[in-house]
């Protein structure tokens, strides 16, 4: 069996997280890394680019995704510091269950290479 690691934003996981129940039902070897910045990031990026500083309907109040994974019968851990990620990943792999790693990140960090502040600055610079 092949192991799978999936990366999902918090908004994405809120829309499709119920599929984790299927992963548990079929004992799939999957680890879902939920990157939680507390918003629908792509939509917010478009808002900042077109209407800097005007936020509408993109903020999220999220559940504890790690606890949700455990409630489904899987393995779940919350990761708040980068240094804690690799040990959590190893524990998830060793658990023998479908797993969710709930990673808390800065709301400004919109992608690996960009931030909301940089997007806003580009949009407001003539």
What are these regions (language model features)?
Residues 1-126:
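Thiamine diphosphate
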